[in-house]
Regions:
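An N-terminally biased module of ancient metal coordination in phosphate/nucleic-acid-related enzymes
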Residues: 1-85, 91, 95, 160-162, ...
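Residue-level marker for buried hydrophobic side chains located in beta-strands
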Residues: 7, 38, 152, 226-228
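Conserved, mostly hydrophobic/aromatic
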Residues: 10, 29, 97, 155, ...
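Hydrophobic residues within beta-strands of alpha/beta enzymes
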Residues: 37-39, 97, 153, 194, ...
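Extended substrate/RNA-proximal surfaces in nucleic-acid metabolism proteins
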Residues: 51-189
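Glycoside hydrolase catalytic-domain groove-lining segments
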Residues: 164, 170, 174, 181-197, ...
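Long, positively charged, glycine-interspersed low-complexity recognition regions
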Residues: 208, 212-217, 221-270
Length: 270
């Protein structure tokens, strides 16, 4: 089995919006024969109910470091954070960061892009055009990648979460693909690994991972690197969709993926 299937560094626990404790997630990883497991709690953001509060972040860091010591020699544990592009960066050191866009600024308001279909429809009405909305999202991604110290670009086409039926916008339209590809190009230029994220599959929103096949093709053409994650919010689904994601990567011509270990990224054959 490829090592890419025995690691996940995008996980959420009871310290933010996850259902499982960190130790429950560790035990699930051990049962699956994992080589590494990363915790990526949502970094503090006053506008985001899913984010860790400052006091919770202190407790989160303490607990992950405790588990790292307790399970030393059994599993490599990494202390990470998922950073939202509109929030400040943490004062604490982390082993790695995932850079994600969950919110857009528009006319003085913050709009959450992954809350619900009804909210997405309302956002599109505010922008007056679905492609203007998508362009604003991808431009926010590109700007974030340009300045971010992160290692990983999170769920790059999250804006498509509620477009499973393709009725909100056409993901093959150049007005969608153009800005998406520009964001991908910035991620690759800045050296970020692009996660292939099965989280929306686990929660029933999409039949395929982020990013969509057309964007994976662009990523391969650009020479970008991928890392497989499940965006896990429930330890029971730690590798949900991994087999399908692996098949998709192979079909799109990827021969290797990255695995994040204690010493940094390693490239592994698919």
């Amino acid at each position: 089995m490829t090592e890419a299937l025995r690691s996940c560094v995008h996980t959420h626990t009871t310290f933010c919006d996850g259902a499982s404790t960190p130790e429950e997630t560790v035990r699930a990883a051990l049962a699956l024969g994992f080589v590494s497991l990363g915790f990526s709690g949502h970094g503090a953001a006053a506008y985001d109910d899913a984010a860790m509060r400052p006091e919770a972040e202190v407790q989160y860091r303490r607990e992950i470091l405790r588990l790292r010591a307790a399970y030393a020699g059994q599993l490599e544990l990494l202390l990470g954070q998922e950073h939202d592009a509109l929030s400040p960066y943490a004062d604490y050191p982390y082993d790695y960061l995932i850079e994600s866009v969950h919110y857009l600024r528009h006319q003085g308001d913050l709009l959450c892009v992954d809350l619900s279909r009804a909210d997405t429809e309302a956002h599109i009405r505010r922008f007056g055009d679905p492609y203007a909305y998508c362009r604003a999202y991808f431009e926010t991604c590109a700007a974030a990648y340009e300045k971010s110290p992160a290692n990983i670009a999170g769920h790059l086409d999250l804006v498509s979460k509620f477009n499973g039926a393709g009725d909100l916008f056409d993901e093959a339209d150049p007005r969608y693909l153009g800005p998406a590809r520009e964001a991908l190009a910035v991620a690759v230029e800045r050296g970020l690994a692009v996660e292939v994220n099965t989280g929306a599959m686990a929660r029933g929103y999409r039949p395929i991972p982020y990013p969509a096949p057309a964007l994976l093709r662009t990523l391969r053409e650009l020479g970008g690197r991928v890392i497989l994650t499940s965006d896990c919010h429930d330890a029971a689904r730690l590798t949900y969709g991994y087999a399908e994601a692996l098949a998709l990567l192979r079909a799109e011509g990827f021969r290797t993926a990255l695995v994040l270990r204690a010493g940094g990224f390693r490239e592994t054959a698919l």
